[in-house]
Amino acid sequence: MASQLTDAFARKFYYLRLSITDVCNFRCTYCLPDGYKPSGVTNKGFLTVDEIRRVTRAFASLGTEKVRLTGGEPSLRRDFTDIIAAVRENDAIRQIAVTTNGYRLERDVANWRDAGLTGINVSVDSLDARQFHAITGQDKFNQVMAGIDAAFEVGFEKVKVNTVLMRDVNHHQLDTFLNWIQHRPIQLRFIELMETGEGSELFRKHHISGQVLRDELLRRGWIHQLRQRSDGPAQVFCHPDYAGEIGLIMPYEKDFCATCNRLRVSSIGKLHLCLFGEGGVNLRDLLEDDTQQQALEARISAALREKKQTHFLHQNNTGITQNLSYIGG
């Protein structure tokens, strides 16, 4: 194995977020309010199963332990189950997760688990069916809830649920969410709304700091847990009276980037050192043949020397991120 991926600030990278499509069938207000529009960058289409196999093999050799498949909506790819199986071929990768809108969860989750999937994140921004419809543009609330139930039925011990925290939309619904997870092993993760190139007006209107929820959770006796090295950025809280957990993802908080442990590869094969970074490093020309792995690993390692200390979101920098489907959120 090559040496562990480490940047100039001594941060080690165990976690790859791999986008496999930027297509999505939902129209969430904070991401794709006008629906998916092809960007014109699909010169070769999205990464193939073989290309995904090669890029994840290289990252595994460089110390990656966890791969999250993202989009867009990953399950819209007809070969999604094959993609899971291809990533699973790497023994060094202990966790394979997906972030999904839950649209096909009920139908396909058993097949995904059989292929090697170990973790599921489902986006649910409201537990009110009408508000869910208003946020996503899809009247699929009951279908998504059935999908979460199906995940438990096929053997997943925990499901993570992502909720984008929005002022005057869902920030006042904490009690409703807590009731939902009291007897369910769901890690409910409130994610602060982030400003993107296309979402500045929405950000100004609806952003609220996750510190508001953190203060309330601590007041109610919730306990902050320690992070593991391949965990995502959430601050996780537990309570003895609840089967579920609460996670808070607060990218505007001081020192948020100090524990960064993840890199991103886009659906067209570009390595992004930060969700809000500039440009990206092309890897696709080194994904054509198995004999290119050493050169691929060298390019990834060299690129990491350019990773900045912080995302500079607090300075109103949004980089090239037009919307969160662009490189997988």
Curated annotation (Swiss-Prot):
The keyword GTP-binding applies. Pfam families: Fer4_12, Mob_synth_C, Radical_SAM. Keywords: 4Fe-4S, GTP-binding, Iron, Iron-sulfur, Lyase, Metal-binding, Molybdenum cofactor biosynthesis, Nucleotide-binding, S-adenosyl-L-methionine. Its EC number is 4.1.99.22. It is an enzyme of class 4 (lyase). Binds 2 [4Fe-4S] clusters. Binds 1 [4Fe-4S] cluster coordinated with 3 cysteines and an exchangeable S-adenosyl-L-methionine and 1 [4Fe-4S] cluster coordinated with 3 cysteines and the GTP-derived substrate. [4Fe-4S] cluster 2 binds at residues 257, 260, 274. Pathway: Cofactor biosynthesis; molybdopterin biosynthesis. It comes from the Bacteria. GO terms for biological process: Mo-molybdopterin cofactor biosynthetic process. It catalyses: GTP + AH2 + S-adenosyl-L-methionine = (8S)-3',8-cyclo-7,8-dihydroguanosine 5'-triphosphate + 5'-deoxyadenosine + L-methionine + A + H(+). Its cofactor is [4Fe-4S] cluster. InterPro entries: Aldolase_TIM (IPR013785), Elp3/MiaA/NifB-like_rSAM (IPR006638), MoaA (IPR013483), MoaA_NifB_PqqE_Fe-S-bd_CS (IPR000385), MoaA_twitch (IPR010505), MoCo_biosynth_MoaA/MoaC (IPR050105), rSAM (IPR007197). Residues 8-234 form the Radical SAM core domain. S-adenosyl-L-methionine binds at residues 30, 72, 123, 194. [4Fe-4S] cluster 1 binds at residues 24, 28, 31. CDD domains: Radical_SAM, Twitch_MoaA. The keyword S-adenosyl-L-methionine applies. GTP binds at residues 17, 68, 99, 160, 262-264. GO terms for molecular function: 4 iron, 4 sulfur cluster binding; cyclic pyranopterin monophosphate synthase activity; GTP 3',8'-cyclase activity; GTP binding; metal ion binding; S-adenosyl-L-methionine binding. Catalyzes the cyclization of GTP to (8S)-3',8-cyclo-7,8-dihydroguanosine 5'-triphosphate. Belongs to the radical SAM superfamily. MoaA family. Monomer and homodimer. This is GTP 3',8-cyclase.
